[in-house]
Amino acid sequence: MSFDGFFLHHIVEELRSELVNGRIQKINQPFEQELVLQIRSNRQSHRLLLSAHPVFGRIQLTQTTFENPAQPSTFIMVLRKYLQGALIESIEQVENDRIVEMTVSNKNEIGDHIQATLIIEIMGKHSNILLVDKSSHKILEVIKHVGFSQNSYRTLLPGSTYIAPPSTESLNPFTIKDEKLFEILQTQELTAKNLQSLFQGLGRDTANELERILVSEKLSAFRNFFNQETKPCLTETSFSPVPFANQAGEPFANLSDLLDTYYKNKAERDRVKQQASELIRRVENELQKNRHKLKKQEKELLATDNAEEFRQKGELLTTFLHQVPNDQDQVILDNYYTNQPIMIALDKALTPNQNAQRYFKRYQKLKEAVKYLTDLIEETKATILYLESVETVLNQAGLEEIAEIREELIQTGFIRRRQREKIQKRKKLEQYLASDGKTIIYVGRNNLQNEELTFKMARKEELWFHAKDIPGSHVVISGNLDPSDAVKTDAAELAAYFSQGRLSNLVQVDMIEVKKLNKPTGGKPGFVTYTGQKTLRVTPDSKKIASMKKS
């Protein structure tokens, strides 16, 4: 079910009973299109979430906690000016549309009484949140600015007069008079599609359910449907404020708890996508630059292949110095390396010995270039490997991991810290319980955690796991120095799951004691080398991994 006007009617009733006469204590904007108000009401603190997201737009109380940006937006600064300490006078739905108006009162800087309306319009990609002066109807601020060039019907900019979205001819099913309703029910075709055009705020699921019940005693069936008590119901794919037929779902105490559960993974994945998009773009750009650099370096190294030829020519000129003429641009000598004659180019301005030294200098220069380029190539390859590991964890990260990965990229110099951006606190390492019911397995979810786990936490005798030859997490069996094969398999499956091979049917995983790992000098976080490992072959299983998670 969509967040339609029918659902909104029920949740507005819920919010009204909880929040009216409460005071707004804090206002934050954890994400670009979402707003959270902390409200004190009925001796309790509530968090009110307003979302103008194009897919997950909604209004609800939430138990979810959010990390707020260090630098508040202009929108938040204006809202704090007008709403901090404000009293909530009313919360109303506009007809049965997906628009909610919350009227608040407060005092300005000189103590005068002011009223404002916080409006949320839940309209797909056109969703918005606005603060409007109650008396003048002027927009004080809006979360998404919409100019005349974007919408000729109404301009949504600070200072503009607020104009509501265009209304339709459809009727409010909650307030329609019996006479008009009776006429419609008797004369109109009561299909779901037609019901949606006749009445405001009916999503597809609501209209389908209404069509199903309007078979006999239509007037009373209609009234009962819209007057029934709220009984939130959640299925795997949808939610409703009341149970619908053929919909075996989980009941909830209130609509806000239902929405928290329904949107938790969906909204978090989208937030992760939003937060990670900048980092992914940066990492992809750096990968592209370094791959291009590697090709160039390898091409330059290939050009040094004739270094040995210069050395041999210098040796031959030195050996047969008495046969080398002056004032000639070439000489043919016996090549004792190949037992074939060889023609050697000469500089007529130089003596035979100087020509020999010229070839030795060329050889030495190329030899130094080979070492320099070989070192550069190894460094570039290590950077590419590191960035690929960051890309892998970004694609598997949750919100907390994203913040840590950003901190990692700041520390490694790939991005700059924003002004006033705080240093991110290190998240605790994830723990998993092995199949023996007692062994703890630690997993690093980014390179800083990998570094900490492998070189600070793990004991030298403990077993360490990593997906073979692909980016992934470091995994350590903690405490158990003689784990069973089943526990080793558990750890290998964790290493496979938290790697680039997560979706593969079979992943090779290296297993080795921590003491055999080597950290190269100057190596990037999480980079290790090793030899003498054993390799296991496992299949990642997401359900098993989820069941093992301890914290």
From Swiss-Prot:
<dbReference type="GO" id="GO:0072344">
    <property type="term" value="P:rescue of stalled ribosome"/>
</dbReference>
<keyword id="KW-0843">Virulence</keyword>
<dbReference type="GO" id="GO:0042603">
    <property type="term" value="C:capsule"/>
</dbReference>
<dbReference type="InterPro" id="IPR051608">
    <property type="entry name" value="RQC_Subunit_NEMF"/>
</dbReference>
<dbReference type="GO" id="GO:0043023">
    <property type="term" value="F:ribosomal large subunit binding"/>
</dbReference>
<comment type="subunit">
    <text>Associates with stalled 50S ribosomal subunits, binds to RqcP. Interacts with human fibronectin.</text>
</comment>
<protein>
    <recommendedName>
        <fullName>Rqc2 homolog RqcH</fullName>
    </recommendedName>
</protein>
<dbReference type="GO" id="GO:0019843">
    <property type="term" value="F:rRNA binding"/>
</dbReference>
<dbReference type="InterPro" id="IPR008532">
    <property type="entry name" value="NFACT_RNA-bd"/>
</dbReference>
<keyword id="KW-0699">rRNA-binding</keyword>
<comment type="similarity">
    <text>Belongs to the NEMF family.</text>
</comment>
<keyword id="KW-0694">RNA-binding</keyword>
<dbReference type="GO" id="GO:0005737">
    <property type="term" value="C:cytoplasm"/>
</dbReference>
<dbReference type="GO" id="GO:1990112">
    <property type="term" value="C:RQC complex"/>
</dbReference>
<dbReference type="GO" id="GO:0005576">
    <property type="term" value="C:extracellular region"/>
</dbReference>
<keyword id="KW-0963">Cytoplasm</keyword>
<comment type="function">
    <text>Plays a significant role in virulence. Recombinant protein binds to immobilized human fibronectin; binding is saturable and competed by heparin. Purified protein inhibits binding of whole cells to fibronectin.</text>
</comment>
<dbReference type="InterPro" id="IPR043682">
    <property type="entry name" value="RqcH_bacterial"/>
</dbReference>
<keyword id="KW-0648">Protein biosynthesis</keyword>
<keyword id="KW-0820">tRNA-binding</keyword>
<dbReference type="Pfam" id="PF05670">
    <property type="entry name" value="NFACT-R_1"/>
</dbReference>
<dbReference type="GO" id="GO:0000049">
    <property type="term" value="F:tRNA binding"/>
</dbReference>
<dbReference type="GO" id="GO:0009986">
    <property type="term" value="C:cell surface"/>
</dbReference>
<comment type="function">
    <text>Key component of the ribosome quality control system (RQC), a ribosome-associated complex that mediates the extraction of incompletely synthesized nascent chains from stalled ribosomes and their subsequent degradation. RqcH recruits Ala-charged tRNA, and with RqcP directs the elongation of stalled nascent chains on 50S ribosomal subunits, leading to non-templated C-terminal alanine extensions (Ala tail). The Ala tail promotes nascent chain degradation. May add between 1 and at least 8 Ala residues. Binds to stalled 50S ribosomal subunits.</text>
</comment>
<keyword id="KW-0964">Secreted</keyword>
<dbReference type="Pfam" id="PF05833">
    <property type="entry name" value="NFACT_N"/>
</dbReference>
